[in-house]
A protein has these predicted regions:
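GST-like domain detector, emphasizing the conserved glutathione-binding G-site
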Residues: 2-135
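C-terminal helix/juxtamembrane-tail motif
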Residues: 210-224
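Residue-level recognition of oxygen-bearing side chains
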Residues: 77, 196, 209
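Positions that flank functional sites
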Residues: 39-41, 166, 219
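GST-like fold's C-terminal all-alpha helical module
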Residues: 107-202, 206
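Phosphate-coordinating loops and pocket residues in cytosolic domains that bind phosphorylated ligands
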Residues: 52, 206, 215
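Active-site-flanking alpha-helical
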Residues: 83, 176-177, 214
Length: 224
């Protein structure tokens, strides 16, 4: 690809997963080009230009042109690859091999398995499914609140998830948290129900790199 930047990031304008990869790239000052495939979220098979790089046909996928066009997909794996390879000063990550490093992995896995699927299923049933079964909506809403409860319990005792500083672990939760609390959950007051988690989330969202990326997303969505 001829854009001259180190990375190509396959993403989706409204969806959260590509954007939290962009958060990490931006935090580390790494150059990247967003590519938005014509992805139908209701289709079982992704477009050919995406399947070429990700056999699962979903975003995100990342090409590292500085590493022989190495391709990696799944947002948690991508973020771990980026910080392990490029965050040599440990600005937003912990040193491999340390106990804190594995705690960081723990939270990345929890985000990928505990936050993303439940939050994503609520979006699916609330926005795309032809029927709106209340029992299903309640199921995923309750799971989302359970995840927030896990975060609330931990963050009530410490400022950040691991390492006494904001890391890739904290940042990985941000895009889904913002989307679900501002556009999907009904009759939900984040600050009232989970005040510590809401405060933590706002601190992450206010970081210059995060704000820059999220503002870019807003502009793209406004353009249609």
């Amino acid at each position: 690809m001829s854009h001259g930047k180190q990375f190509t990031l396959f993403s989706l304008k409204p969806g959260p997963n590509g954007w939290h990869v962009a958060f990490i790239l931006e935090e580390l000052g790494l150059t990247y080009e967003n590519v938005f495939p014509n992805l139908d979220v209701t289709a079982h098979q992704g477009p050919e230009d995406l399947v070429k790089y990700n056999p699962n046909g979903r975003i995100p996928a990342l090409i590292d042109h500085g590493n022989n066009d190495f391709v990696i997909w799944e947002s948690g794996a991508i973020n771990q690859y980026i910080v392990d390879r490029y965050d040599k000063e440990r600005k937003i990550s912990l040193a491999p091999g340390t106990e804190e490093y594995y705690t960081q992995l723990q939270w990345l896995y929890f985000q990928a398995s505990g936050q993303g699927p439940y939050f994503g299923q609520l979006v699916w049933f609330a926005a795309y499914h032809p029927e709106k079964p209340q029992s299903v909506l309640d199921r995923y809403t309750n799971e989302i609140k359970r995840v927030f409860g896990v975060l609330e319990g931990v963050l009530s005792k410490q400022e950040w998830l691991v390492g006494n500083k904001p890391t890739v672990a904290d940042i990985s939760f941000c895009s889904w948290n913002e989307i679900i609390t501002t556009t999907v959950l009904q009759n939900f007051n984040f600050e009232k129900e989970f005040p510590v988690t809401a405060k933590w989330h706002k601190k992450i969202l206010a970081r210059p790199a995060i704000k820059k990326v999220w503002d870019e997303r807003a502009k793209l969505l406004a353009q249609g």
